[in-house]
Swiss-Prot record:
Record's compositionally biased regions (Basic and acidic residues): 354-373
UniProt keyword annotation of RNA-binding present: no
One matching Pfam family: DnaJ_C
Protein name: Chaperone protein DnaJ
Renumbered zinc finger spans (CR-type): 133-211
Disordered, as annotated region: 346-373
Binding site for Zn(2+) 2: C163, C166, C185, C188
CDD domains per record: DnaJ, DnaJ_C, DnaJ_zf
Length: 373
């Protein structure tokens, strides 16, 4: 699995100060520390990930290498071309060992081309926008290819020279006992080249921080956490490598009336106690405007009415969900004397009829009576 961007891990911007980075790390360390989360392997993974990110971004030299080359600048195993699980190229590894023994020299020159980092953008949209789809513009900070030197890092009219330490391979051999092991060149950070006359715009990095504005189409039916991929809109690659992608993550704003549950919508429906007792027709809101609904007599609080097809049509579906209205019978307030008089009269009639008009209350009183006997 590819490593996450270190800035994303700590939840800070790429231009974050040392203090902001330290504060973000402390917060995550407190949250995911193994002592606070025993028997929780996920928390331990998050803790290690945050620690690794902090160790790089809190060191000026490592951070500069990471900003310029991504994970490959601080971790040799992250270089492009590594196989599954970080084992690298099998033939290259054994070529280095046996090449030294038998004179084969199987390493060869590497291009050290790295793909740009993927970026993440959190976008908040309304429930209506999620249901109908929308198009909006966003402005994001990225590491883009320097237009002055076209990514070479060298002043226009000049070219980078071959690294004298690794001879342009991007890696150096270290002798360990009988074996020769390859490591990323500490001088050129794996690029195989050195810039003698740096570009005045990017100062030799080949990339510059920029803000770019993009138009994002949000399809109808998206839900919380859905990701929209914009290919090639991430950070610029290194040494001519392909750019990364941008992932727009959808978050839904809290709606004043509706709560979403997949394709279905839920809302509370307050009705007067007279409508609840006698029945009637009420008007309720939907995403398509108002709709009329009949309330049957003797409706109680907690009753749920369903309006088919008044929910949301999810992505990759041809059917709309439903709208569920949850009844709340309102008790009248700020009564006039006349209203109080009528309610007392109603209560007297109810008592005279042995509570048959309030079956739940009668049943409850019977249970209470039996309890104390």
């Amino acid at each position: 699995m590819a490593k996450r961007d270190y800035y994303e891990v700590l939840g800070v911007n790429r231009d974050a100060t040392d203090e902001e980075i330290k504060k973000a790390y402390r917060k995550l360390a407190m949250k995911y520390h193994p002592d606070r989360n025993p028997d929780n392997p996920k928390a331990e993974e998050h803790f290690k990930e945050a620690k690794e990110a902090y160790e790089v971004l809190s060191d000026d030299q490592k951070r500069a290498a990471y900003d310029q080359y991504g994970h490959a600048g601080v971790d040799p195993s992250a270089a492009a071309g590594a196989g599954a699980g970080g084992f690298g190229n099998f033939a290259d590894a054994f070529g280095d060992i046996f090449g030294d023994i038998f004179g084969g020299g199987g390493g060869g020159r590497r291009s050290n081309v790295y793909r740009g980092a993927d970026l993440r953008y959190n976008m908040e949209i309304s429930l209506e926008e999620a249901a109908r789809g929308t198009e909006t513009k966003i402005r994001i900070p990225v590491m883009a290819e320097c237009e002055t030197c076209h990514g070479s890092g060298a002043r226009p009219g000049t070219q980078p020279v071959t690294c004298s330490t690794c001879g342009g391979h991007g890696q150096v051999r270290m002798q360990q006992g009988f074996f020769s092991v390859q490591q990323t060149c500490p001088k050129c950070h794996g690029s195989g080249k050195m810039v003698k006359d740096p570009c005045p715009t990017c100062h030799g990095g080949g990339r510059v921080k920029q803000h770019k504005t993009l138009s994002v189409k949000i399809p109808a039916g998206v839900d919380e956490g859905d990701r929209i991929r914009l290919s090639g809109e991430g950070e610029a690659g290194v040494n001519g490598g392909p750019p990364g992608d941008l992932y727009v993550v959808v978050h839904l704003k809290k709606h004043p009336i509706f709560e979403r549950d997949g394709a279905n919508l839920h809302c509370e429906m307050p009705i007067s106690f007279t409508t609840a007792a006698l029945g009637g027709e009420i008007e309720i809101p939907t995403l398509d405007g108002h709709a009329k609904m009949k309330v049957p007599p003797e409706t109680q609080t907690g009753a749920v009415f369903r309006l088919r097809g008044k929910g949301i049509k999810p992505l990759r579906s041809n059917e709309h969900g439903d709208l569920f209205c949850h009844v709340i019978v309102e008790t009248p307030v700020k009564l006039t004397e006349r209203q109080k008089e009528l309610l007392r009269e109603l209560e007297d009639i109810n008592q005279q009829d042995s509570g048959k008009h309030s079956p739940r209350e009668k049943s409850w009183m019977t249970k209470v009576k039996d309890f104390f006997q």
